[in-house]
Amino acid sequence: MSKKLGFALSGLMLAMVAGTASADMDGGQLNISGLVVDNTCETRVDGGNKDGLILLQTATVGEIDAGVLNDTVGAKAKPFSITVDCSKANPNPGSTAKMTFGSVFFGNSKGTLNNDMSINNPSDGVNIALHNIDGSTIKQVQINNPGDVYTKALDATTKSAVYDFKASYVRAVADQTATAGYVKTNTAYTITYQ
């Protein structure tokens, strides 16, 4: 290689390094989450797919008037169900399904789900509560609490079970009013069998 070409390439490399070092830089983070399962049985949210979208009705700030309560749903409660169907499972996973809930990004110590404050114009001071509805019994789901297990026997004939829940708005702090804005959060449910 000639010395002229070597000097030209060296100069180009210095220009690239110098240009990169002096440039302004912007960036951000990507939150990536997922779930890997062995698909022992099929699950469906509201009769659809295993992943569901629960759309709550619009609530006024005044309607979100309390923090989370163990045996009472919050504002604009939306019912939804999760069906576990083991009729096609081979081998049979057992006769009982046990469900828990967790959230990598939005769980908190009250067992509710924080609002995603990274969205445009988020509501501040509001959480989402999930409650299990078992007949006339209402019980708050404790997100990220592995001891908060919802157990159902699989029907002997259909090999299935249906869990009923409600999602609702609650105050993040009981004595602080929520602000107007959008609400978005997520949770994952996990089912084990015995």
Curated annotation (Swiss-Prot):
Q: What induces it?
A: Repressed by H-NS.
Q: Name one GO biological process term.
A: cell adhesion
Q: Which UniProt keywords apply?
A: Disulfide bond, Fimbrium, Signal
The chain's disulfide connectivity reads: 41-86
The residue range of the signal peptide is 1-23
Null mutant phenotype:
Deletion of the operon under classical laboratory conditions does not result in any major effect on E.coli capacity to form biofilms compared with the wild-type strain.
Mind telling me which Pfam families this protein's record contains?
Fimbrial
Instruction: Say where the protein is mainly found.
Output: other
Q: Name any GO cellular component annotation.
A: pilus
Q: Which InterPro entries match?
A: Adhesion_dom_fimbrial (IPR000259), Adhesion_dom_fimbrial_sf (IPR036937), Adhesion_dom_sf (IPR008966), Bact_Fimbrial_Adh_Pro (IPR050263)
Query: What is the top-level taxon of the source organism?
Result: Bacteria
State its location(s).
Fimbrium
Q: What else is known?
A: The operon is cryptic under classical laboratory conditions, but is functional when constitutively expressed.
Family named by the database record: Belongs to the fimbrial protein family.
Entry function? Part of the yadCKLM-htrE-yadVN fimbrial operon. Could contribute to adhesion to various surfaces in specific environmental niches.
What name goes with this protein? Answer: Uncharacterized fimbrial-like protein YadN
Gene source species:
Escherichia coli (strain K12)
Gene that specifies this protein: yadN
